């Protein structure tokens, strides 16, 4: 789930270096789940690289446990748009996306802070929304998106992510859930989630 897959500024390409080191150590096959950027396999062109997506498993569970009506699939940012499109095609639904406008004049915790989220897509009113991404790191963007969708009249909001890291804990998610900013979060056990969560 490494995100050091493309160079920004003077950052290293840690994911590519790690894969090359595994190859030097004699690893002869790489199996991973939902690589942040599957193109990182280009760093090891002579090794088989299997990238397994849990999309269908998550979707099966969602469809068996939820009473979904008018579905709309939404990407929380431009980076997850391909994933959202895939879900939308499987569900024969529309797709929307949030654009993150950032303040490029400053850096906070290694990133340009988000100034605003702008939704681009069809009306969310009375729809069951699936917000899909590969990972939830801190979750602040996902929570902001959920709040905005509910304020715009979404019937239900479901967060779906392969990796739920909760790098800033779950208090924000608990509060957002209590405020009805989202209805349920679907994830996998591919990242460690403490029992108290």
Give the ranges of each region predicted by the language model.
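PRPP-associated nucleotide enzymes
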Residues: 1-197
């Amino acid at each position: 789930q490494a995100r050091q897959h493309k160079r920004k500024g003077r950052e290293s390409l840690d994911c590519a270096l790690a894969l090359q080191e595994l190859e030097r150590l004699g690893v002869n096959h790489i199996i991973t789940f939902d690589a942040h950027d599957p193109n990182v396999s280009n760093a090891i062109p002579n090794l088989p690289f299997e990238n397994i997506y849990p999309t269908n498993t998550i979707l099966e569970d969602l469809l068996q446990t939820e009473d979904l009506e008018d579905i709309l699939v939404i990407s929380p940012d431009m980076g997850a748009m391909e994933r959202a499109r895939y879900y939308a095609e499987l569900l024969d639904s529309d797709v929307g996306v949030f654009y993150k406008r950032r303040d490029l004049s400053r850096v906070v915790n290694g990133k340009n802070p988000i100034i605003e989220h702008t939704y681009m897509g069809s009306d969310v009113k009375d729809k069951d929304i699936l917000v899909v991404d590969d990972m939830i790191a801190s979750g602040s963007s996902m929570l902001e998106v959920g709040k905005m969708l509910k304020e715009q009249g979404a019937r239900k909001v479901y967060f779906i992510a392969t990796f739920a890291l909760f790098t800033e804990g779950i208090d924000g998610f608990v509060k957002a859930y209590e405020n009805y900013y989202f209805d349920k979060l679907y994830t996998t056990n591919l990242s460690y989630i403490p029992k108290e969560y």
